[in-house]
């Protein structure tokens, strides 16, 4: 990043405003969340934008994760408590049937003005998945990676079957989206190579600058292996 734009998430902010630069004094939507964008000009920082979701609601926790492109013109915001059962890009934001499914919102800055560009959901949206707990965008802003640490799929590896397993709750997943000619689409559905119950794969996520490498954290994975490429199937460190 060029260091002149800063985005700060405040996931417990309470305003019911929507969009950019709405009513900051409203406090009627507890824990709806907000993001504040600051810009540095001639060595001085000033707030440039107050950003809310397009479907603000209580307990969505918009701002639970944020990421900026290198030039600061693309902003990704996670809302891990968002409740729509929509899937894919720009689905039904007004649905409220999947509590804590989660969503990601993409905003673009043009001529100093921020506007929402896309509303992003998983291809297998599920209640409680917390999609948007972690987000990362590539340097050019054309790739987006999203973690959903409480997703329940049993697949392993890349683009496996997206079916929930009652025995693999919170195994976790990550999703990669790509922008081409201004249109976003899902490129990959990622699971750990040793998917297991409660691993929280997707609890942290990071794309390299060129988007060719992705790191995914699984903070409750249970192997006692050390170093690189150790025994993934060891389950001796059980979290109780």
Regions found by a protein language model. Give the residues of each.
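Conserved beta-strand/short-helix segments
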Residues: 1-237
């Amino acid at each position: 990043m060029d260091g002149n734009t800063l985005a700060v998430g405040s996931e417990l902010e309470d305003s019911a405003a929507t969009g950019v630069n709405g009513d900051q004094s409203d406090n009627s939507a507890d824990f709806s969340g907000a993001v504040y964008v600051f810009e540095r000009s001639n060595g001085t920082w000033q707030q440039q934008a107050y950003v809310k979701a397009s479907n603000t609601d209580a307990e969505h926790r918009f701002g639970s994760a944020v990421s900026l492109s290198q030039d600061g013109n693309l902003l990704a915001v996670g809302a891990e408590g968002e409740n729509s059962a929509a899937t894919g890009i720009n689905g039904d934001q007004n649905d409220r049937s999947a509590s804590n499914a989660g969503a990601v919102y993409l905003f673009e800055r043009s001529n100093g003005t921020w506007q929402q560009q896309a509303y992003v959901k998983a291809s297998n949206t599920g209640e409680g998945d917390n999609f948007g707990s972690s987000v990362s965008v590539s340097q050019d802003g054309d790739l987006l990676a999203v973690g959903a640490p409480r997703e329940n799929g049993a697949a392993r590896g890349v683009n496996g079957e997206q079916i929930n397993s009652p025995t693999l709750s919170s195994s976790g997943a990550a999703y990669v989206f790509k922008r081409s000619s201004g249109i976003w689409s899902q490129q990959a559905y990622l699971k750990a190579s040793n998917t297991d119950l409660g691993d929280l794969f997707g609890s942290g996520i990071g794309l390299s600058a060129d988007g060719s490498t992705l790191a995914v954290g699984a903070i409750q994975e249970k192997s006692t292996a050390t170093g690189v490429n150790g025994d993934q199937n060891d389950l001796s460190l059980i979290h109780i």
